[in-house]
Swiss-Prot record:
GO terms for cellular component: cytoplasm; nuclear speck; nucleus; THO complex part of transcription export complex. It holds the Pfam family THOC7. Belongs to the THOC7 family. Component of the THO subcomplex, which is composed of thoc1, thoc2, thoc3, thoc5, thoc6 and thoc7. Component of the transcription/export (TREX) complex at least composed of alyref/thoc4, ddx39b, sarnp/cip29, chtop and the THO subcomplex. The keyword Cell membrane does not apply. GO terms for biological process: mRNA export from nucleus; mRNA processing; RNA splicing. It comes from Xenopus laevis (African clawed frog). Its main location: cytoplasm. Keywords: Coiled coil, Cytoplasm, mRNA processing, mRNA splicing, mRNA transport, Nucleus, RNA-binding, Transport. GO terms for molecular function: RNA binding. Residues 75-194 form a coiled coil. InterPro entries: THOC7/Mft1. It is found in: Cytoplasm; Nucleus; Nucleus speckle. This is THO complex subunit 7 homolog.
Amino acid sequence: MGAVTDDEVIRKRLLIDGDGAGDDRRINLLVKSFVKWCNSGSQEEGYSQYQRMLSSLSQCEYSMGKTLLVHDMNLREMENYEKIYVDIESSIAAAHEKIAECKKQILQAKRIRKNRQEYDALAKVIEQHPDRHETLKQLEALDKELKQLSHTKENAEDKLELRRKQFHVLLSTIHELQQTLENDDKLAEESQESPMETQNP
């Protein structure tokens, strides 16, 4: 399991603290304290309301700071998701290119196989005339070319198998990354709903 980032720690702490909950109540208390302070009948009462007003104002400033912090954190996450999206698009494009290349290699392997069959048939015809020196020379040349084609075919098949394995790994990685992004989105939605459920029991 990977190390927890600072953004994740901050986000969890803000969610536990109930970010956004009670902001209206704090503002209302601040307004009421201000009205009572204006209407205070004595210096002692005015000082008491003044202290309450400062306390409410401090809470509002603290809440606003948390909100701005969450906003900045969300912006960073959006930028990160956009980068991941671009990487996925690039990986998909590369996968399509590899698929096209594999198809070309398959067609080449089929042509090699067809050529080998044709050469085998021709070799059988040549073998019917073993008494001719020129025919034997042609047969040797064809046999050499056939071996080269067979070697080329084996190399192409090995390369094609390697590309298939690489493509399978790439698709698995893309699937895991998409699953991770979906899980992150679900966790983010659940985390946003949790403070609302706490505020409205």
